[in-house]
Amino acid sequence: MTRRYWNIDLE
């Protein structure tokens, strides 16, 4: 799950 919603890959 990376660029699906926001910067969820960074959270």
Curated annotation (Swiss-Prot):
Protein name, entry field: Small ribosomal subunit protein uS2c
Subcellular location per the Swiss-Prot or TrEMBL entry: Plastid
Keywords, in A-Z order: Plastid, Ribonucleoprotein, Ribosomal protein
Protein family membership: Belongs to the universal ribosomal protein uS2 family.
Gene name per UniProt: rps2
Statement: the UniProt record of this protein carries the keyword Ribosomal protein: yes
Top-level taxonomic group: Eukaryota
Gene Ontology CC annotations of this record: plastid; ribonucleoprotein complex; ribosome
Organism of this sequence: Conopholis americana
Keyword Ribosomal protein applies: yes
